[in-house]
């Protein structure tokens, strides 16, 4: 008698869990999908209601007739809900993974149905496949510890404030340029005095409401700059304390010429502080600096870098790569760039600097993990 596909699937698929649980998260309601490997069950609960989660898990056990101490595995997509749910599930004895949503396979049709039930079913089926042995099915997020996640707030707040400062400065310039006026430094201490002396094209003072709006915008700008100054001082205070391993890594990075206060902090808190890279390929791939080939049949082309990961770290690494060429001209990496790319045009140099950034991150990782100084690099003298 021939075996059906379903029978073969059950026979040759290793069952690593008794109950699978997938979360489809949204603002007001969460969709929960359960399966014992054969049947499925879907329920809606109020968002962030932990009591309902425990209740539905118990009902799922009864539905699937699971008794005793069973193994439960779960998953949800990484997003704005962060990692608190992951930590809660682990505390409850549920083995949870957080999945990169961009790595989930979807239909390539021009139009495809999308509902919470369909998404929950898809997550649930992929979770069973993942624990059935398909480990490369999707990308699992490396969840930071609570302290590591907390330490990232300082540099991310500085990043947000810096964007806000640029917006305030541009808004002030835009309001004045509408009257044919231009100021060099909208955040200067004497800006208000300069504002009083400004005159329009016909010699008149600025309209009262416009002047009042510019003044309020200036006050908001000054407040943002004061907060940025406070955060920078707090950052230096923490580095001097060297209270954690991450802070000691920040101080270690600063011993290299070309690595400044901001870049050393961002690299450690976002990348080197708590992520466990196993090899140089993972280091280069994290900020999205690795190539993306397209080689199918007779079609072969390069699609550029993958641009995965945080754009801030990718942009910062390229910025620091240019600085490395300037402040470490005798290093092996700088000499390699000069030999391969310096003689070409601007386009060739831009391609080359991406390779420098990728290689530099690998060298910085080796320096922090194994104490190997980048070849030819100069260290700052101890003060």
Task: Give the label of every model feature segment.
Residues 10-35, 123:
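Gly/Thr-rich phosphate-binding beta-strand-loop-beta motif of the actin/hexokinase/Hsp70
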Residues 35-71:
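Nucleic-acid-processing active sites and adjacent nucleic-acid-binding tracks
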Residues 69-79:
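Short glycine-rich phosphate-binding loop at a beta-alpha junction
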Residues 97-140, 194-195, 299-308:
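Short alpha-helix plus adjacent loop in nuclease-associated cores
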Residues 151-252:
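Glycine-rich, often acidic, oxyanion-interacting loops/wings at catalytic, nucleic-acid
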Residues 249-255, 261, 265-349:
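Phosphate-backbone recognition surface of nucleic-acid-processing proteins
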Residues 298, 338-383:
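Low-complexity, acidic/Ser/Thr- and charged residue-rich accessory regions of DNA metabolism proteins
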């Amino acid at each position: 008698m021939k075996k059906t596909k379903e029978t073969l699937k059950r026979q040759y698929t290793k069952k690593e869990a008794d109950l699978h649980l997938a979360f489809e998260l949204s603002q007001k309601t969460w969709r929960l999908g359960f399966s014992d490997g054969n049947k499925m069950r879907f329920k809606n609960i109020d968002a962030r209601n932990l009591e309902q989660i425990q209740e539905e898990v118990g009902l799922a056990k009864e539905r699937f007739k699971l008794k005793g101490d069973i193994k439960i595995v779960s998953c949800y997509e990484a997003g704005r809900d962060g990692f608190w749910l992951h930590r809660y599930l682990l505390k409850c004895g549920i083995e949870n993974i957080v999945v990169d949503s961009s790595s989930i396979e979807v239909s390539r049709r021009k139009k495809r149905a999308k509902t919470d039930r369909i998404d929950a079913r898809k997550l649930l089926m992929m979770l069973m496949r993942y624990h059935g042995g398909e480990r490369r099915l999707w990308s699992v997020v490396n969840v930071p510890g609570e302290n590591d996640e907390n330490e990232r707030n300082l540099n991310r707040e500085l990043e947000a404030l810096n964007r806000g400062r640029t917006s305030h400065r541009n808004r002030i310039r835009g309001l004045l340029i509408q009257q044919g006026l231009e100021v060099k430094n909208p955040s200067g201490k004497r800006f208000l005095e300069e504002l009083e002396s400004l005159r329009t094209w016909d010699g008149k003072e600025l309209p009262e409401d416009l002047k009042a709006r510019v003044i309020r915008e200036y006050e908001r700008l000054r407040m943002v700059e004061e907060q940025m100054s406070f955060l920078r001082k707090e950052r230096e205070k923490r580095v001097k304390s060297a209270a954690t391993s991450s802070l000691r890594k920040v101080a270690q990075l600063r011993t290299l010429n070309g690595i400044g206060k901001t870049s050393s902090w961002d690299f450690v808190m976002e990348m080197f502080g708590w992520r466990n890279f196993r090899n140089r390929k993972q280091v280069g791939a994290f900020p999205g600096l690795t190539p993306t080939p397209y080689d199918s049949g007779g079609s072969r082309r390069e699609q550029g870098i993958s641009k995965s990961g945080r754009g801030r770290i990718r942009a910062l690494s390229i910025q620091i790569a240019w600085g490395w060429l300037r402040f470490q001209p005798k290093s092996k990496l700088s000499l390699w760039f000069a030999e391969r790319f310096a003689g070409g045009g601007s386009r060739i140099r831009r391609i080359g600097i991406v390779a420098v950034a990728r290689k530099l991150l690998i060298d910085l990782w080796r320096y922090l993990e194994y104490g190997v100084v980048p070849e030819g690099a100069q260290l700052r003298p101890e003060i």
